[in-house]
A protein has these predicted regions:
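A generic short-segment signal for beta-strand/edge and adjacent turn/coil regions
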Residues: 1-5, 38-43
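N-proximal, solvent-exposed amphipathic alpha-helical segments enriched in charged/polar residues
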Residues: 1-18
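C-terminal structural segments of small proteins and small subunits
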Residues: 41, 46-77
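Short edge beta-strands and adjacent turn/loop segments
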Residues: 16-32
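Charged, low-complexity, helix/coiled-coil-prone segments
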Residues: 1-3, 28-30, 69
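Short hydrophobic/aromatic beta-strand micro-patches
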Residues: 34-36
Length: 77
């Protein structure tokens, strides 16, 4: 999986998101994302993270999932 593919999953689910994704190991399966969105306003940090995790959950499903580890940081804009 590429950083662009991870970003596309997030932007598809949260269209106004400003997203930065890093491949943390260079292996294409461990990523870190910073996501800012107006949709996060008034939501708890956990609720914000759940919105992002929902966007990538299919890529993390199963033992051979292309996305193995995912670290997320969020903020409202």
């Amino acid at each position: 999986m590429t950083t662009d593919e991870v970003k596309a999953l997030i932007v598809h689910a949260i269209p106004d998101a400003v997203v930065t994704v890093r491949d943390t190991t260079g292996s294409g399966d461990h990523f870190s994302a910073e996501v800012a969105s107006a949709q996060f306003a008034g939501k708890t940090l956990i609720a914000q993270h759940l919105l992002v995790m929902d966007a990538v959950k299919e890529a993390m499903a199963g033992s051979h999932a292309p996305l193995h580890a995912f670290d997320v940081r969020t903020k409202a804009i």
